[in-house]
Amino acid sequence: MRRSILWLVVCLMLGSCALAAQSSSPTSPVPEQQSAATQRTPPAPQTPPPAPASSPPQLQTIPGTQAPAQLPTTGTLQRLTVQDAEALALKNNPQISVYRLLALASQQVTRQQKAAYYPDLYGSLTAVKPEEGSRIAAGNLNNPIVYERAAGGLALSQLITDFGRTNNLVATAALHAKAANMNSVATADQIKLAVDQAFYNALQTVALLKVAEQTVSARQLVSDQITTLFQNKLRSQLDVSFANANLAQARLLLLDAQSNQQAALSLLSEILGYASQQPFDLVESAEELKPPPDSVSRLVDEALSNRPEIAAQTYEYQAAQRFQKAERDLLFPSVEALGVVGRTPYSNTVAGVTPFTSWYGAVGANVNIPIFNGFLYPARSREAALRAQADEEQLRDLKDRIANDVRASWLNAITAFNRIGVTQQFVDQTNLAVDLSQTRYSLGLSSIVELSQAQLQQTEAAIQFAAAKYQYQIAESVLRFQIASSSPSGP
């Protein structure tokens, strides 16, 4: 009897060892004759053991994958705050130079119009050898006789008055120059806004990259644990498939995050005026985020007073008014003084008489009175008046659009600020849901589907929370731009 019992114990021990050796092999297939209840129903609740050191993680390498995309960079790593980025862009961005040069060019137009205030002095050298008896028979009404001569002299003309036309043309050019200068200021504000958006987008991609890396790490751990449980016949192939699918999804998220970070840094480098991507160490501001103002009406009034686009369009409207007056003044006479002086060192005699003296000079005045030119001047004046009215309507439309943009930006800023707190609650609740789902799954009270759903929500919450802070800073920058505020800490 004792011998039979001892033999039975030895057989059981040998069978257990063989079964354990077979189950420890990572390539051992699932027995096909295993019942469905055994495959779907987990055994008694127990704590999942850690993955053995000898067991390689599942999906550690995926065939056909490559290293993350990395754009080539030039230069050394430099720390960069948003204020430093704005200063670099204002210094290096070619759009700043373009509008600054256009403003300088507009100032030269003013000098061109002012030239009418000054005398027009020019010199002439003339030498004539006509055919004998030649007369100018065709062309203008002038003296047809052509004398043989060689002479040189100076001619001077000076505008006395054109009854305001020149003054209005000079004022028109000066107002255009002021409008060009305001356009240069508006361009600088737009570049600063683009810098802020690119800077905070780059910071957001860095935060999302960290979220993606943490997600991959967490799901890798879950995949390893479930794979180990499956190898020990404690979980089914379905559990392993769900875990590995979640891991692959996290890796896709990581690839997108890596690509987006490189693209964001490339865009930031381009806005800062670099031809190639630069390596930046972006530094966040330590200032606490402040909520937007409570009243939007004050912001609208501030925008209508400060926006350089409104100032530029106002100058354009005023310039159109002055130009209309200048076109109207074409109907008035113009008075100018004339003077000539010169010397004739050589001239031929005609019938024994010298037709020229050795020196000559004269002064006089000329009055030009427009009488009729086919209604050209009235049409030009009417055209200028209509264009001035169009500029006035454009100014009114611009003010309406800016007021609407301020209201929309204010609403976006409030929404973005409120999203920070809501996404924090979202993160807290999803973290709790993942902990509870993990516990229920470990105890065998739920399926892998519940745990996978909780992990997906946790990842979504982490992404939303990482983006909420930077999206508010972008919305804050847009609001500052809309009201033309130079405060870096908020409106």
Regions found by a protein language model. Name each.
Residues E86, G153-A155, F199, V300, ...:
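Membrane-embedded beta-strand positions in outer-membrane beta-barrel channels/transporters
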Residues A115, Q249-Y274, A416, Q425-S485:
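Short segments within alpha-helical structural elements
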Residues P68-Q78, R111, S124-Q158, L282-P293, ...:
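Small/polar, glycine/serine/threonine/aspartate-rich low-complexity segments that form flexible
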Residues R2-M13, L19-Q46, E131, L443, ...:
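Acidic, low-complexity, intrinsically disordered peripheral segments
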Residues S97-L101, K114-A115, V146, I160-A188, ...:
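Sec/SRP-type N-terminal targeting helices
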Residues A186-E302, N412, A416, Q457-T459, ...:
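Periplasmic alpha-helical coiled-coil/stalk elements that build and connect Gram-negative outer-membrane
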Residues A21-T126, E132, L159, S276, ...:
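Bacterial Sec-pathway N-terminal export signals of envelope proteins
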